[in-house]
UniProtKB/Swiss-Prot annotation:
Record-listed E.C. numbers: 5.6.1.7
Assembly behavior: Forms a cylinder of 14 subunits composed of two heptameric rings stacked back-to-back. Interacts with the co-chaperonin GroES.
Keywords assigned by UniProt, alphabetized: ATP-binding, Chaperone, Cytoplasm, Isomerase, Nucleotide-binding
Top-rank taxon, per record: Bacteria
Native organism taxonomy: Bacteria, Pseudomonadati, Pseudomonadota, Gammaproteobacteria, Pseudomonadales
Encoding gene, per UniProt annotation: groEL
Species this chain originates from: Pseudomonas putida
Protein name: Chaperonin GroEL
């Protein structure tokens, strides 16, 4: 086992504090409408330019092991805030830096670290409760656009496109962000249910100009196994009774596919085949989703129905189906609203229960396909570097707007935290050390407002005092240098983002204050480099001149 280096007390905390400040100083430069950019070098390719706090935090790794521990703990604050609300990473980092700096001063002055932490926790709980009281529901498109704009570093085009996407697909809908090919952001909305499987043969195409297969008023045959014999293919065609038919199966191959293609080309029956989406159990669940949406039934031997015994009653109906090389879209399925609602309810319950982020994401996609729709935002930019930076901002703004819809909005620009101070003005702890912890958090919650002001080139103390003297939504617009009603000026933050940032900062900050020892691998003494190897036998080379 490698030797360890151990540090105790103040010497450990001082080292940790250096790391905290290095990371936080790099991250906090990006805060607010006048935040600066940070350039990140890459091991290959062009450097990346970003104003995203978590992207900056992820890049930082320090040489000194003890300083690095401090930096990594603050990185954890940014990640926690990002996981909880998808945004607010810079605010969380600024809050954590303030809590740790003030807390370690108090510990050095002889305060009890455990009581300080209890005071911080008590004050945090009171501020969080007050933030919930301050929050207003975010229902209309205008408020959603404002939240998106603020989160995307005051880019109104991003806020507006997200609001438009949410309006089109609803709160449950899936909105994905992709790299576009033009200079402008584009929004495309998919009607009905779309899944990422295309036609199994180009011979199904009946619109050569767009290379898609389009079926009007088709029946849908859903099968949870492979179809490989021509007899099975004939059974499927017989079941459709001459109407256009879409076959969704685990696979259609060999003779069966050849039979379907020939019959389609001869005009005997209008047919197209596609692989079922997903794999394993997820494939079965998605087939069932399609069945519910179209009012059909999955042909499965598990429930005693085979292809040979399938009848018209087992088939689903839709107004139209469009198959491209990559995707299949089912428009206006004929499923009963009550059954779709029951299925949606079931998926929501599974989302609540699952602990896997991957499963949750897949379940949310399924939910959106049944309940809402799918919108794709294609990000446009002049260069690849700008594209990556812009895409990260769009993703941030999307998370922020979802959080706003979930828990409402509060005045932005650090004002909500300052207003929430009212909850801890008269708060008292069980002893004097706890009171110091409460006072410490009281100062810390002003730090985002002060940092936004400093980044805008104004005097933080003057602005903080003026905002504290005001009430309600009165605050400071760093973009214009004006004071006024933050909500009217369109400066909103999602309550969930502000709450998550404070909770993550107080949690990690409190743990760092109570640190008494730090253990890291001792630096290894590298052996000195040797000289040149012996060149014996080459002495006669001089005579070659």
């Amino acid at each position: 086992m490698a030797a360890k280096d151990v540090k105790f007390g103040d010497s450990a905390r001082k080292k940790m504090l250096v790391g905290v400040n290095v990371l936080a100083d790099a991250v906090k430069a990006t805060l607010g409408p006048k935040g600066r950019n940070v350039v990140l070098a890459k091991s290959f390719g062009a450097p990346t330019i970003t104003k995203d706090g978590v992207s900056v935090a992820k890049e930082i790794e320090l040489k000194d092991a003890f300083e690095n521990m401090g930096a990594q703990l603050v990185k954890e604050v940014a990640s926690k805030a990002n996981d909880a609300a998808g945004d607010g990473t810079t605010t969380a980092t600024v809050l954590a830096q303030s809590i740790v700096n003030e807390g370690l001063k108090a510990v050095a002055a002889g305060m009890n670290p455990m009581d300080l932490k209890r005071g911080i926790d008590k004050a945090t709980a009171a501020v969080v409760a007050e933030l919930k009281n301050l929050s207003k529901p975010c229902a209309d498109s205008k408020a959603i656009a404002q939240v998106g704009t603020i989160s995307a570093n005051s880019d109104s085009s991003i806020g507006e496109i997200i609001a438009e996407a949410m309006e089109k697909v609803g709160k449950e809908g899936v909105i994905t962000v992709e790299e576009g090919s033009g200079l402008e952001n584009e929004l495309s909305v998919v009607e009905g249910m779309q899944f990422d499987r295309g036609y199994l043969s180009p011979y199904f195409v009946n619109k050569p100009d767009t290379m898609v297969a389009e079926l009007e008023g088709p029946l849908l045959l859903l099968v949870d196994k492979k179809i490989s014999t021509s007899r099975a293919a004939a059974s499927t065609e017989r079941a459709s009774a001459g109407r256009p038919l879409l076959i969704v199966a685990e696979d259609v191959e060999g003779e069966a596919l050849a039979t379907l293609v020939v019959n389609n080309m001869r005009g005997i029956v209008k047919v197209a085949a596609v692989k079922a989406p997903g794999f394993g159990d997820r494939r079965k669940a998605m087939l069932q989703d399609i069945a519910v949406l179209t009012g059909g039934q999955v042909i499965s031997e598990e429930i005693g129905v085979s292809l040979e015994t399938a009848t018209l009653e087992h088939l689903g109906n839709a107004k139209r189906v469009i198959l491209s090389k990559e995707n299949t879209t089912i428009i206006d399925g004929a499923g009963a609203d009550t059954e779709i609602e029951a299925r949606v309810k079931q998926i929501r319950a599974q989302i609540e229960e699952t602990s896997s982020d991957y499963d949750r994401e897949k379940l949310q996609e399924r939910l959106a396909k049944l309940a809402g729709g799918v919108a794709v935002i294609k990000v446009g930019a002049g260069t690849e570097v700008e594209m990556k930076e812009k895409k990260a901002r769009v993703e941030d703004a999307l998370h922020a707007t979802r959080a706003a819809v979930e828990e409402g909005v509060v005045p932005g620009g650090g004002v909500a935290l300052v207003r929430a101070l009212n909850a801890i003005v008269d708060l008292k702890g069980d002893n004097e050390d706890q009171n110091v912890g409460i006072a410490l958090l009281r100062r810390a919650v002003e730090s985002p407002l002060r940092q936004i002001t400093a980044n805008a080139g104004d005097e933080p103390s003057v602005v903080a005092n003026k905002v504290k003297q005001g009430s309600g939504n009165f605050g400071y617009n760093a973009a214009t240098g004006e004071y006024g009603d933050m909500i009217e000026m369109g400066i909103l933050d999602p309550a969930k983002v502000t709450r998550s940032a404070l909770q993550a900062a107080a949690s990690i900050g409190g743990l760092m204050i109570t640190t008494e020892a730090m253990i890291a691998d001792a630096p290894s003494d590298a052996p000195a480099g040797g000289g040149m190897p012996d060149m014996g036998g080459m002495g006669g080379m001089g005579g070659m001149m």
